[in-house]
Amino acid sequence: MTISQETLERLAADLRRAEQQGEAIPPLRDAIGAENGEAAYAIQRLNVAHALAAGRRLVGRKVGLTNPKVQAQLGVDQPDFGCLFADMAYGDNETVPFDRVLQPKIEREIALVLERDLPARTPTWPNVANRHRLGACRPLEIVGTVSPTWNIRFADTVADNASSGLFVLGGPARRLDGLDLRGAAMRMTRNDELVSSGSGAECLGHPLNAAVWLARTLARLGDPLKAGDIVLTGALGPMVAVNAGDRFDAEIDGLGRVGVTFSQS
């Protein structure tokens, strides 16, 4: 399905307006097709350009759809990615306004912080996994959607910045030496009750697989990852709905604990 530039710009503006007003809108796939990744990424790029023109600062990327069960649910066989901006970041144990993200859910992930630029050519696993290029830290990602009741398909989440809302970053980053990112167990509680668990193996088999996929994808687009970029590699367990006033704490073996509280309104 070929989508006109005028339609892409209108849909991008619809997304921005929905996010600003905190109101759900009909799924974008109704206009572009459920699996039209090309149009969906074009809409995402339009809104990223709008954000940069407004003075927002790009600090990294997120990888989504890294769990095979989620891929099967949405009928896709690949991850997607979105952009992280500085004004989306919160620190460990900070309070997040509940209304900052529409229909919020939360995921526990592994974040990688680049200490050196990645090659502009197609990066390899050794390029990405080089211990001198990476540090690892503990994030929570708060995702959301403008589609009613999380009724989304591939095109909907891609266009909507891969459903990215906010992220909480616990630090400082630590070297990869001695870390078993694949086998690391994750546990997340909501108000002291266990609500999500998993391991690094649930993120494309290994969190570094997600990072390599992202690095190669961005290199092909002529926008390689740079020193200082943050990469959220994908959920290690099921995402969990957030209610006003909730407190979440999550721990990953070897990386430690990170927490966040949501305001009452």
UniProtKB/Swiss-Prot annotation:
Q: State any single GO MF term.
A: manganese ion binding
Enzyme Commission number(s): 4.2.1.80
Provide the cofactor list for this protein: a divalent metal cation
Q: Which InterPro entries does the record match to this protein? A: Fumarylacetoacetase-like_C, Fumarylacetoacetase_C_sf, Hydratase-Decarb/MhpD_sf, Keto_pentenoate-hydratase
Task: Give the protein's function.
Answer: Catalyzes the conversion of 2-hydroxypentadienoic acid (enolic form of 2-oxopent-4-enoate) to 4-hydroxy-2-ketopentanoic acid.
Q: Which HAMAP family does the annotation name?
A: MhpD (MF_01655)
A Gene Ontology cellular component where this protein is annotated is: cytoplasm
Q: Pathway it belongs to?
A: Aromatic compound metabolism; 3-phenylpropanoate degradation
Q: List UniProt keywords, sorted A-Z.
A: Aromatic hydrocarbons catabolism, Lyase
What protein does this entry describe?
A: 2-keto-4-pentenoate hydratase 1
- Which species? Pseudomonas putida
Q: Which family does it belong to?
A: Belongs to the hydratase/decarboxylase family. MhpD subfamily.
| PANTHER family reported for this sequence | 2-KETO-4-PENTENOATE HYDRATASE, ACID HYDRATASE
Kindly state a single biological-process term from the GO annotations of this entry.
3-phenylpropionate catabolic process
